[in-house]
Amino acid sequence: MVAYRFLTLISLGLGSHCASALQYGYNQVSTHKDSAVVAGAFPAINGTHLQSPAFTSPGTVPRGFSDGTSGPTRDETMEGFMRRLARSNSWMTYHKADFKSEEGRKFPYMYLSASKSSIEKPSSHKLRVWLQGGVHGNEPAGDQSMLALLGDLAANQKWAAKLLEKMDILVLPRYNPDGVFYFQRYLATNFDPNRDHIKLARQQTRDIKELFARFSPHIATDMHEFTAGRAFGPKKDIIYAADALFSSAKNLNIDEGIRQLSEKLFAKRMGKDIEAAGLRWDPYIIQGESSSSKLLLREAGTDAKIGRNAMGLSQCVVFLCETRGIGIADQHFERRTLSGLVMVKSILQTAVDNFDEVYNTIERGIRRFTNSRNDIVLTDRSPIMERTFGMLNTTDATLFDYPIDFATTTPAQAVLTRSRPRAYLIPPSWPDIVKRLEVFGVKADKLPHSYVGPVEALNVTSVTFDKEYYEGVVTTTVETKLVERNIRLPAGSYLVKTNQKNAALAFVALEPENIDSFASFGVIPVSTGDQYPIFRVE
């Protein structure tokens, strides 16, 4: 108890975002199920038949699911389900990753293909699709919707065959098995798995990202849930009405054609498909702080530390798909899982129905990005507009459109840009930086000889510490001035060329002004007056 109080005092002193202290394991949120009035606005959808373990084998659901202390599907139940499907369907292959979680749990995944392709040898002229769930362990409709998709494909062979004519699919249903075991958001070490995509603090993050980079998908989805009971308004009597919130990748260093494809084709179709299923949706948002009396909601941001943008920076179409479920235990679970299933099926069907447009747009976007000499974007802003957002009154379950200020990232507006270097030079004393880049799928050439010549260097003019302690570091905001100089670096230095598909991940990591850069997270520590030890080659 003394230790717990000590941690609580630390968290309260470090900032408002540290709402409570964490312990080892079982960091579970409070359960507040919907009242009967609110629950009436989220009825079961007639004709729903979900082909996943929680619904086909209800006897396997742990008791703790009903009170919010457990998810519905244990690891062994999930693995047995996946193995049975693979045995019965030649186009489904069950795999276990060659790495394990922080507590030694396995990562089973399914590879779906109508040909003899594999991750290492993909089919030619087919879309590669990566689907993941269970990133946060207390969001069970995320991985359950992935299992429901597998069951649906097995039950609808013609539909599966139609999809697999045009794509190969990798399904990783449970990204965070330790978090699922403890029914907590975090990894076993209490790092947030969805905030570790650039700093790469945990080996588990690196292992999964290396698998992702090897597969090199054209399309990816990340299945989550959002807090059901978050209340707004002067009386705290209105909540989000949506069953589903979704967002594409927003970072401005993603090819514009790929971002436009996400918004104008996939997002529009997804909204229509959600409504056709009798469900409600809105764009994914978080609450912001506003100086006015009007509620400010911020659309999903551009920060690369989040999986949606980190995956998108490999120049692919990515969607974060969220369903209404955190904090309500097993309530409405069928409707929640259906919401996730509808979204992922919409993405797959849209890709197949528009295969030529989707495949060619993404491939052209990759080539355009790889060969581009356009400036890169280091910081951006979200312009604020007025709009309405679907809300539900908790006193009488009235559905209505609520006026809000909306900080939009469709698109964000660039603030600080810089010329795109042809390469970065990294001294041999920083092999850990190179290793991180290689995890991203960025190639680095080790120079057999010394490098002597002109470079662009960055002199640090300002380092401002943020007010909060975040996952072991106090992050910084760094400002620099670009200068030209001649440099001599020894043999064994690294040259990272930027005419490669995943170079945008190098941009956000290596340019110190970026909010998620290695400098910001102290991976490359700098102080005012220093010269940043990574150099740009023009």
From Swiss-Prot:
It is an enzyme of class 3 (hydrolase). GO terms for cellular component: extracellular region. SUPFAM superfamilies: Zn-dependent exopeptidases. Keywords: Carboxypeptidase, Glycoprotein, Hydrolase, Protease, Secreted, Signal, Virulence. GO terms for molecular function: metallocarboxypeptidase activity; zinc ion binding. The keyword Secreted applies. Its EC number is 3.4.17.-. Its main location: secreted. Its cofactor is Zn(2+). It is found in: Secreted. Glycans are attached at N46, N393, N459. GO terms for biological process: proteolysis. The active site is at E322. Pfam families: Peptidase_M14. InterPro entries: Peptidase_M14 (IPR000834). Belongs to the peptidase M14 family. This is Carboxypeptidase 2. It comes from Trichophyton tonsurans (Scalp ringworm fungus).
